Amino acid sequence: LKAENNKILKEKKNWILLLFKKLAKLIFNRIFYVAVAMLVQLGWILMMVLRLAAYSRYIDIGLRLIGIVLVLWILNKEINPSYKLAWTMLILILPILGVVLYFVFGRSRIAAIMQQHFEQRIEESREYLRDRPQTRQKLEALDPSASNQSRYISDVSRFPVHENTTAEYFQVGDDMFPVLVRELKQAKKYIFIEYFIINDGVMWQTILNILEEKAAEGVDVRLIYDGFGCLTTLPHKYYEELQKKGIKCQVFNPFRPILNIIQNNRDHRKLCIIDGWVGFTGGINLADEYINQKARFGHWKDTAVMLKGEAVWNMTVMFLHMWAVIGRSEESIDYEAYFPHRYHEGEFESDGFVQPFCDTPLDEEVVGEDVYLNIINKAKKYVYICTPYLIIDNEMMTALCLAAKSGVDVRIMTPGIPDKKLVFILTQSYYRQLLEAGVKIYEYQPGFLHAKSFVSDDEIGVVGTINLDYRSLYLHFEDGVWIYRNRVIQDIKDDFIQTMEYCRQIEPEFCLNRNIGLRIMQNIFRAFAPLM
């Protein structure tokens, strides 16, 4: 009996110790301090507004009138109807809180000064980002529909379509990493890296050692990381450590615990450019879980593409724009110093048409979503889609359902093990309507699917960073590669079909048999999805 009591006592001590460890980890986490600081500010603002409203009946009436005027203003804005509905409901249900939240978080445009700097850089580089007439004519003669899709990207995103480029597709980060290391080691003139998340570990330390060596050799090594994406993964002022190693480094929109709408806009892009003619992009960040060196949410399924050739120029210009804007440089960029042919002898191989592009919250154009919609609307046989999050607006829902009802084989693959449970519940709330229209949905059972890709009709595809959710489509800086009649199209399709073997196909009964409480919660989340 005494031994049994000692065992129970020991288990209790271990449980208490574990609880204290978790509590200490939370308290000393930077996210904890940021969250507390922001909640205190929001609480203080709300308390002041409520006190004013309680102090005077006229102030209370005035605040409610402001809410009504604000609703009318929102309804007449040229924004996505889903945003209009979400904000209108919030303001009408909770007038005072809704008004406060809208003025703090509601406007999606980035800071005016940043917008001005981007527009200046885009205008400055215009002459270096023109379609080659012979390339455009060739694509037009080959497929007018594909040419129209490409022309939209050229005209709106400002990045031209290219030939003289090859592509290699990677089914998982485990395959991409050794190739990335090999190419980095061969760098002669410059390495430009821009990522949303960097985390210390096998992947980053391997890359960092190469970057340090290359910087010592005189290679121009530059790095951009996102202030929020790396909030918990890198030390405070990590850029100073890198600069001591000879690596030029800038932080996009450093995250500060201040209520500010600008904090909504993040740099979600993932770019690695080497000597102007080798470029990587896709869903893979620089952290061990992306190459399955660390287990998080089961097996991590992600994809990437490596380009070699003239199309890498688009990526280089994207990076140079971002670098100049973050640094608030007033000097003109010497674009000719970074041309692809400058550091590559001979001609590039050519395989189809390749067009890297970016999407920004700088304007009212949702380039990423429009590129996806173009593919769906023009599909004749099939569209296969990979996305970690499925939180879509009415336009995307209508396009997917219409394509399926028109006989197009529409398949969507999502994670089986989520990284964010709330977002996963919201993702699953869209299943029923899609299934009823004939869309097939698959959940990747071994773990977390983080890939973002479209492929259609054995001819056209996109690989990049753009998720099917509101944050990616409306608030973040993103990038992708539009690909036409390149051999990687077949690779993307084959990967999707092979991955289906590890998926569970979702049947209509899955949605119908969910408990009523969960379905009510999903409906509430759906109403406010654009704000999440």
Positions of PLM-derived features:
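N-terminal localization/anchoring segments of enzymes in phospholipid and broader phosphate metabolism
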Residues: 1-370, 374, 378, 418, ...
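Glycine- and other small-residue-rich loops at beta-strand/loop junctions that grip anionic moieties
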Residues: 196, 389, 423
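Helical hairpin unit composed of two closely spaced alpha helices linked by a short loop
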Residues: 379, 389-410, 415, 420
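Thr-Gly-centered strand-to-loop micro-motif
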Residues: 386-387, 414, 444, 463-464
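Short glycine/threonine-rich loop-to-helix capping motif typified by GTGT followed
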Residues: 398, 424-428
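Surface segments flanking catalytic/ligand-binding clefts of nucleic-acid enzymes
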Residues: 440
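Catalytic-core elements of nucleic-acid end-processing and repair enzymes
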Residues: 452
